[in-house]
Amino acid sequence: MLKKDVQSPFFYFLSVIEISTFVKNIRMMRTLNDFNFEGKKALIRVDFNVPLNDAFEVTDATRILAAKPSIIKVLEDGGSVVLMSHLGRPKGREDQFSLRHIVDKVQEIIGVQVLFVDDCIGEKAVEASKKLEPGQVLLLENLRFYAEEEKGDEGFAKQLSNLGDIYVNDAFGTAHRAHASTTIVAKFFPDHKCFGLLLYREIESINKVLNDSEKPVTAILGGAKVSSKIGVLENILDRVDHIIIGGGMTFTFVKALGGQIGNSLVEEDKLDLALTILEKAKAKNVQIHLPVDAIVADAFSNDANTKELPTDQIPAGWMGLDTGSKTAELFADVISKSKTILWNGPLGVFELEKFSNGTIQLGNAIAEATSNGAFSLVGGGDSVAAVKQFGFEDKVSYVSTGGGAMLEMLEGKSLPGIEAILN
């Protein structure tokens, strides 16, 4: 039930609008903290899609740790918790994707016994849910063992809704999917649905960059292709002061400007688009910073011959695989003067040690700016992996748990899982 001393107005005006519009009203959003769960059962959609090794042991528990605060809040209120999640992409019921493999890890992290039921709907699930006492946690079997989950089936969602009194969405990683457990189920909790603490913080962090940022704002966009970042580039031009371009897409811009890029990655059909983006940025007084030099190699290998060359003077037979030393200095200077920083995508092929220095130097610059008071948000699978690999996880303000979901928010798109709570 809602706490009587907390005012939590509903979003009565939402249908299909951009994320960038409604997150401006972030302080009106109902979260877990707006409810008292005493004697109540919280049905929480979490994202426990974690990596497992060959022995079915969790190798990265970040997503489980991220969900802990929401679970503990319910338990401390005197409520019980029913957790639902997916794991991998099973085709039907496959043991390797069973969530029973992660029960011990969830139990270890939360600090209380975690019960498990080998189904997520039906008599077994209902009975297990009914037997829950205050302070207990139940983990349901993999939602994707049923095709109805990804189809957004209403009947399946209705069965899920029978397992709890209050619906909580705390799975940012799947918020961009209109699945039964992330979107459809919310309709069965018209007055008893809210955001989990993790999902709220994700929205809050992105909002801080897009709509409530302290200037100057710098966005760092890396990755292989311009085509994968068009939406982001278009949406943030009105919101940032600087855009740093890195990764493979650098060379599409460089070639569009007439540079010689050798065998570097390029999207030939996006050269005009690259020029258009540069023109739009100039018209909006947004400075785009391209790498001025690169570590080039004669093969895509740690054993390749390498040298440092200007990005527009790469000869045939050589390819740019990382940013150079002058670029590191230029980018660090821009970042040091920034008050808000968004990092989405690495600058080079950091997975190969020989081409990781540009990404490491970028991480150092962001970490230093953060220690000096800047707000820094890191998101996107590869950049998050880089942050973890090089030890920057605790040196930035926030590391997002959602790759595709964050990208769609940065593009200004509405996310079904978020709209379902707001509507």
Residue ranges and their predicted role:
Residues 1-11:
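Positively charged N-terminal leader segments that act as targeting/secretion signals
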